Amino acid sequence: MELSFKNILVVGLGLIGGSILKTIKELNIPLEVYGLDLDEEVTKKANNIGLINNIDNQLRKIEEDCLIVFSVPSLSIERAFELIEDSFNDEKVIFTDTFSSKSKLLEFLESNTKVGEKFVMSHPIAGSEKSGLANYNSLLFKDKLVVLSAVNGDKDNKKLNKVKNFWELLGSKVTIL
């Protein structure tokens, strides 16, 4: 199984976001890896430990195909999107998330329909009682269920399959609603 994008940007570098990045690195998945956190010191720490290529929250524009994963608290989706909105090519991006609660995300997507057209909702059933980047775990998603749903309800769309392949490469079992 191979990925159809060359870059990944994880926005939110806590337990889940950090674990995504650590898994990519340990499995040697061939991606250019970027990360941002609402706390720029966390972004710098992720760079210092070798999880991401960028050194701070100032990204160059990613021109090639990119998966952007929002792994911030769901109430912070608007702020997180503002942080990255100039960092990607609109024609070559797919968005997904790791939120368990989708209500704030759906509100955001209703008022940002262009983003919604490129969004696949993800809910990894994985976690820990611990939080923060310091607790990342490359096995967090192994054999764990990830539930996917296209914003438009189309189960056969290409974006959905690309996100499904991504989670499967991380070791997850994927189901589509």
Regions picked out by a protein language model, each given a short descriptive name:
Residues 1-59:
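NAD(P)+-binding Rossmann beta1-loop-alpha1 motif at the extreme N-terminus of oxidoreductases
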Residues 6-7, 32, 92, 118, ...:
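Residues at the starts of beta-strands that form the adenosine-phosphate
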Residues 34, 56, 120, 175-177:
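General small-molecule cofactor/ligand-binding pocket signal
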Residues 38, 72, 98:
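Short beta->alpha hinge that forms the Motif I/post-I loop of the SAM-binding pocket
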Residues 60-94:
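Rossmann-like NAD(P)-binding element
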Residues 83-134:
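Rossmann-like NAD(P)(H) cofactor-binding subdomain of soluble oxidoreductases
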Residues 141-177:
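Internal alpha-helical scaffold of NAD(P)-dependent oxidoreductase catalytic cores
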